[in-house]
């Protein structure tokens, strides 16, 4: 041994290396340590799933909101339309479904008269001008022209003009008064009693008064129209006319076997005889003539004025009824008494008066014809 070894005996001793320092990470014995790539995968999957779920919820919410808004808008529009329809129900219907005019039978029931010009009184120039022209076509009335008068307001129009107007409107085109065929004139120029002639007080007193209607039996009516007095002048100041009021009474007419052609019917006026011949129909709905005779102061009849009247020709049944009534009239005419003397009837007015005897028959209500028909009869002095 060397002296050095002897001096330091610990130099030959070999010391082991120090152990490494302990790591800071703690590993659980239950869950073993995994790699970093395996840890990042669940985080990305959760993030993607969350984003997709959020987008789906947003899209669903927007779709729901849009549908609700559209439904609310449609409901609002429907409510507005319903309110407007409740306030004005005519707006939702077409004109074909809502008929605001009068029926053909109601239009034909409006009285017709013959226009007569008169002298204009001072201070009534404007009223006379308005009463001598039609407010629908703005044409002046001609002498002896047939016109139609509205019973409610006494305004006068051409027959064709007012008929077309009343098909779409139920009021007067001049004053907008509602038209009703049941209305009567203010002064009651025409009043037909329903009682028989023998029970009527006018038949007992044969002195006829102007503006009265003498009713015999239910087959005919005699109308006496005289000159208007001072009280009547205010109502009829616009026109001087002969008023015809259609008054239909329901009587059964025996049809029987009628000929196919209309035979001429004699019309008696005193000692003279006239014959009514067949006339060609200018219109499909026109058939039948009537006459009005003028009675002078001496009680004799003067000029004969024919008047055209219309009946319904909608079906062949009306034609057969017409022929049957013509035959019935010719049979009954021999038994109808004369309705008064000329001398007695001319004593009331002091002036010219007009007498007309007409026969009113009602064909009754049928499915093919809605309006009643008026047929002519003989005129007797």
Swiss-Prot record:
The chain crosses the membrane at residues 46-66. It comes from the Eukaryota. Disulfide bonds: none annotated. Residues 1-31, 249-269, 334-354 are annotated as: Disordered. Residues 250-261 have a biased composition (Polar residues). It is found in: Membrane. A zinc finger (RING-type) spans 134-176. Its EC number is 2.3.2.27. This is RING-H2 finger protein ATL1. It comes from Arabidopsis thaliana (Mouse-ear cress). The gene is ATL1.
